[in-house]
Regions:
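Conserved alpha/beta-domain cores
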Residues: 1-135
Length: 135
């Protein structure tokens, strides 16, 4: 899917946000505890980092698509810089894995964050130093 989108939209920029899964829109095949308020709990990047197999699968697919066009990655529901850096470490691990397998992709793919919760807005200056872009 990402492969086809990247091909069709090139040379325009394709920004792909990683999944914003959580209790309010959880895939039934993923085990996750029931939350009193799923809108405030374990969702977005926190959910993805708690389920690395899901995040890694998506990141590898996005990286493969980056070989075909101007693709960038955006992480949702980032709380602070540490959230972003942790997600970037997972991305680097996926990139290293694909590189070792000889797959083509943009190793320098731009990586950004959505600023959609108050803590991200408060830390936006330090977040901006680590991100290639903010949305």
């Amino acid at each position: 899917m990402y492969h086809n989108l990247a091909r069709k939209i090139a040379p325009k920029i394709l920004t792909i946000r990683t999944f914003d899964l959580g209790g309010d829109k959880l895939a039934h095949s993923i085990d996750s505890p029931k939350e009193d308020n799923p809108y405030l709990g374990n969702r977005g990047i926190r959910f993805s980092l708690a389920h690395p197999e899901v995040l890694r699968t998506q990141l590898r697919a996005i990286l493969r698509a980056s070989a075909l066009g101007n693709v960038r990655i955006m992480f949702p529901m980032i709380i602070d810089v540490e959230d972003f850096l942790q997600a970037k470490r997972v991305l680097k691990s996926c990139a290293d894995e694909l590189y070792e397998q000889g797959e083509k992709f943009d190793y320098d793919i731009p990586v950004g964050s959505m600023v959609e919760i108050p803590s991200a807005a408060i830390s936006s200056e330090s977040l901006a130093r680590e991100c290639d872009f903010l949305s």
